[in-house]
């Protein structure tokens, strides 16, 4: 399941982010890549753990906590602190799958990566190339969203970023461990929740159909969740 979420950040917030990121020091992204990914990764990143990275990342997390579509789709248990990258001058990231387990920064606690997220911080017309290509059961989906919009996709997906031939592609990226690890179960819960949300304004709060569907949702979540 690949889901686009509009306006996680407003245009004003994006401009503020970019003013700070464009003035920041960037490092070679290959330094943080795994052994296999290092050979196909050509981008820049903001230093992990820097004050800027932490401050902007916390702002993103606050926005996500009040974004119902994100909560419904991800059912987040743990979110890896957002990171920031930049692709320019032919920068690219070849086909790869994200690591299944990651240590949370500054701790010995591991998290499982169920979902990957990219929050775009550059408008599509600012750069050529730079599409996020995600392979799924129905082929390859190319994603290039407006600044402030975000895409969620399974971390198990083979994916790549195509070469940026003009301008710069700036984004935040991070991973989510879901309360419901199984992608199929999580998708069913998302579809059911969205149907409930669409039905809610059309019927009375005590409508038996709405009450029953809501009960089914929570009982399935109770069965499948791993808190």
Swiss-Prot record:
EC number, UniProt record: 1.14.11.-
Cofactors named for this entry: Fe(2+); L-ascorbate
Record has Iron as a keyword: yes
Free-text cofactor note: Binds 1 Fe(2+) ion per subunit.
GO biological process, one term: intracellular iron ion homeostasis
Pfam families recorded: 2OG-FeII_Oxy_3 (PF13640), PKHD_C (PF18331)
Annotated ranges, domain Fe2OG dioxygenase: 78-178
Residue positions binding Fe cation: 96, 98, 159
InterPro entries (UniProt xref): Oxoglu/Fe-dep_dioxygenase_dom, PKHD_C, PKHD_hydroxylase, Pro_4_hyd_alph, Pro_4_hyd_alph_FE2OG_OXY
GO MF annotations, alphabetized: 2-oxoglutarate-dependent dioxygenase activity; iron ion binding; L-ascorbic acid binding
HAMAP family, sorted: Hydroxyl_YbiX
PANTHER family the UniProt entry points to: PKHD-TYPE HYDROXYLASE YBIX
Protein name: PKHD-type hydroxylase Ajs_0512
Organism: Acidovorax sp. (strain JS42)
């Amino acid at each position: 399941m690949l889901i686009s979420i509009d306006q996680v950040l407003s245009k004003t917030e994006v401009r503020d982010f970019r003013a700070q990121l464009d003035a920041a020091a960037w490092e070679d992204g290959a330094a943080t890549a795994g052994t296999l990914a290092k050979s196909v990764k050509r981008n820049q990143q903001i230093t992990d753990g820097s004050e800027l990275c932490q401050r902007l990342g916390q702002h993103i997390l606050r926005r996500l906590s009040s974004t119902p579509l994100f909560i419904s789709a991800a059912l987040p248990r743990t979110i890896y602190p957002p990171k920031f990258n930049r692709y320019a001058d032919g920068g690219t990231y070849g086909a790869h799958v994200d690591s299944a387990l990651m240590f949370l920064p500054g701790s010995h606690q591991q998290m499982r990566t169920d979902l990957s997220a990219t929050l775009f911080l550059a408008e599509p017309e600012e750069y050529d190339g730079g599409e996020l290509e995600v392979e799924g059961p129905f082929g390859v989906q190319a994603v290039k969203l407006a600044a402030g919009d975000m895409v969620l996709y399974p971390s198990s997906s083979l994916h790549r970023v195509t070469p940026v031939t003009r301008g710069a592609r700036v984004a935040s990226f991070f991973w989510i461990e879901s309360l419901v690890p199984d992608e199929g179960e999580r998708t069913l819960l998302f579809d059911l929740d969205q149907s409930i949300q669409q039905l809610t304004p059309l019927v009375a709060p005590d409508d038996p159909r709405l009450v029953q569907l809501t009960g089914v949702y929570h009982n399935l979540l109770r069965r499948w969740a791993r808190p």
